Amino acid sequence: MRVAMISMHTSPLEQPGTGDAGGMNVYVKNIAEQLERRGVIVDVFTRATRPLQGEVVNVRPGLRVINCVAGPYEGLSKEELPTQLAAFTGSILAFCREEGVSYDLIHSHYWLSGQVGWLLRDLWQVPWVHTAHTLAAVKNNSLADGDSREPESRRICEQQIVDNADLLIVNTDQEVQDLIEGYDATTCAIRVVPPGADVDRFTPGSDRATERSRRELGIPFRTKVIGFVGRLQRLKGPQVLLRAVAELLDRHPQQQLAVVICGGSSGAGGNELERLQLLAEELGISRCVRFLAPRPPEELVGVYRAADIVAVPSYNESFGLVALEAQACGTPVVATRTGGLPIAVDGGKSGLLVDGHDPSDWADALGKLVLDDDLRIAMGEYAPSHAAKFSWQASAEALHKLYEELPPAGHRGERQPAG
């Protein structure tokens, strides 16, 4: 089987935590690699963002990333990419003609790629699978203060994808409900395939390894560490974490506490790092906040291990891969009760779930784990067993099976309703 994966707006080879690169990059990269290990030939098509990028990157014997020229390499925001959908599609078609390659199936990721997948399905007459990753209707119902609503044009495009895709892949049952309630989707076109974590890479460290990670970050031995990993944007809630920590320190001024925020600015403006630094100064906690540049997985392990707690105060997450990775490293998680996070975190066992984004409520939850060593240690010991329930191998196996079961293009109505 040969699969064309479409990831227009961000490459799986980009560093997560910068620009538009995040959980979706991790998802596409790991799923593609695991499918290739199962004998599937995968070509991932993405938009070239650098002139010397090289059109084709051979990642593995049966996995390539193809950088398609569509518009200027730099200067286009994600919001402007719809103007390049035709150019991107044309680049894919030109590549396929030149290579003499054809595909058995298309799998698009995010709504921009979905529009391309829709056209290619009708041209190639092969089944088309789509994974949304995020939905405008859901994001608009859970905006952070200062965030702009997703445009109606995006919601319309998503509706077209839902109405026409042969199969929709979602992370959780909550996403099934989101598609039904927000887009009038039919369950016969939806299947749930939870994502995973690289549980071979993200593992608990020895006491010595943890001490080494803390030394590298310049954190004193007895200081409690709260970590945050992800793109720096309001949607991810780092500002909520800073306000909660300020309140926690007001309540317990003698507590030795450090906040480690690992990620780069993302979204319109690109100056969220400066805003967060200014907020930390205004709150009087800049002395205990460290900002780290995004790190590759082999270095990110050390950040997770150095943390006593990882906070995921997102306004919405379709799943929450950071939460899984942290737990796999033996670090309990405090996360918002939203989207897929109640699945990613076993509330009360591997971490705590918080309703909403009131800094006082977050200070309560963080304080429980900062001040109660026994509770925090018990949750950290349980966390890896919860994370182990989710693996990329299992995700790819389930996805591969669904690929093979798909009827010819345009016949999704013949499928049986999801059980």
UniProtKB/Swiss-Prot annotation:
Pfam families: Glyco_trans_4_4, Glycos_transf_1. Gene3D superfamilies: Glycogen Phosphorylase B. Catalyzes the transfer of a N-acetyl-glucosamine moiety to 1D-myo-inositol 3-phosphate to produce 1D-myo-inositol 2-acetamido-2-deoxy-glucopyranoside 3-phosphate in the mycothiol biosynthesis pathway. It catalyses: 1D-myo-inositol 3-phosphate + UDP-N-acetyl-alpha-D-glucosamine = 1D-myo-inositol 2-acetamido-2-deoxy-alpha-D-glucopyranoside 3-phosphate + UDP + H(+). UDP-N-acetyl-alpha-D-glucosamine binds at residues 15-16, 23, 231, 236, 295, 317, 325. Disulfide bonds: none annotated. This is D-inositol 3-phosphate glycosyltransferase. One of its GO terms (biological process) is mycothiol biosynthetic process. It comes from Corynebacterium jeikeium (strain K411). One of its GO terms (molecular function) is magnesium ion binding. The gene is mshA. HAMAP family: MshA. Homodimer. It is an enzyme of class 2 (transferase). 1D-myo-inositol 3-phosphate binds at residues 9, 20-25, 78, 110, 134, 154. Its EC number is 2.4.1.250. Mg(2+) binds at residues 304-305, 307, 331. Keywords: Glycosyltransferase, Magnesium, Metal-binding, Transferase.
